[in-house]
Structure formats: structure tokens, C-alpha cells
């Protein structure tokens, strides 16, 4: 990247290279502009102005809301419920330019009554298969409990859409780096052997790790530009040469020859 940017500043016959030119990663996040837009309980209540949207799904307590908040660099954008399974709506967050992030209801919490769970499942099924603006699914999985029965069920619902799935293995900070990478490689192999076209990565909301990798994927889905790195040109240091004061040597007096 640095080489490409430097190429935009060719040296001329009377031009010196910029002093100490380097890139400083931007503190801006891809979803930095996200703001709550609307909650919908039916397909008819979804925004009609949407051009592209990405949906976040995950088992209750897998860290979905925390992942959204981390990606948006916002502590309270997505509500982190103390009672898992209580979010029953599709929550839309406006990213600007008619792009949206959609927080889907959490699933797989045993204490949710079947009468409450059934409408969620119908809504999720319709949304994932019928929503043309949906460009891809971000599936949140706790790295310690990946591919639960409920995760598999959701993936089977989504598969007929033919749209991409990117899996965030959250809470990777709960394992050592070696252990987390071993889990990642094992799961990637299992997915590859099964012929499933999923991509996946490690992610930690606590350590804020994995953000750049996730943003690369989601920016491509939404056709959004990534935040540009800041081009930093520090001031040229000033060097002042110290003047050396020389004292004229006094000629030695000749001794009289006597």
C-alpha cells in the first residue's frame, strides 16, 4: 500500500523526497457512522430505501452485539441484553449511502418458549431467503462452542440463498494464541472438506482483534470504501551546525642566541 501511494508523488527535477513519509493506520472504523434506524417485526416493516445490507446472526450469548459495537467503535450501538433470547426484532443500523447493518434476533436459548421462538424462526427464514438487498451473512460463534446444532440449522436455512457467509469466531481471547489458531485451522479444514463456501476468522471484542480482516470482507459485500490510512509527513528536522571558534596561535618567542 505504501508503495502505491508513494507512486502518486513522483520526484521531479527540482523535488526532494518527503522527509520520513509513512502511513499511520486510521482510527476510523468501517461502521463508524452507524446509527440506529428502525426495528421491524415483519417483512413489511423493513426499509424500502436499502440498497445493500449485511446481517449479523448468532446464538444467544455468542457475543453478537459486542462484535457489532466493536466494529462500529461504539459501546452502546447494539443493545447487549442481560437476558439472552429477548431480542425479537430485526434491528437496522444506518451506515450511510443506503447501506445497513442488520442485527438479527439471537437464537438457541433454551428458556425461550416455543410460542415466542416460532415467529422469530419464520421471520428469519423469510428474511434470509427473500430479502434481495441482503448481500451476506456474518455468523457469530463462540470459539469454544462452534457449529452448534442451532448454527447448523441457521446455515441450512441460509444455504439456498447462495449468498456468502463469513464466520467470526468470537471470544478468541479466552484461548491462548496457539489454541485459537489450532481451532481456526481445524474448523477451516472441516468446512473445506465439507465443500461449504464459508470463510472464517478469529475475533475478540475485548482485545479488539480481527477488526481489519472483518472489515475487508464486509466492505466488499456492501461495496463501501475502507477508511483510508492517514498519510503522515513529519516536519523536516532542523540541523544547526555548531560553529567552531578557532583561536589564532601565538608565535613562540625566539630565545636570544648569546
What are these regions (language model features)?
Residues 50, 76, 89, 116-120, ...:
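Helical mechanochemical/support elements of P-loop NTPase systems and associated helical scaffolds
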Residues 46, 84-91, 105-135, 143-157:
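Switch II of P-loop NTPase G domains
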Residues 125-198:
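Conserved C-terminal guanine-recognition region of P-loop GTPase G domains, centered on the G4
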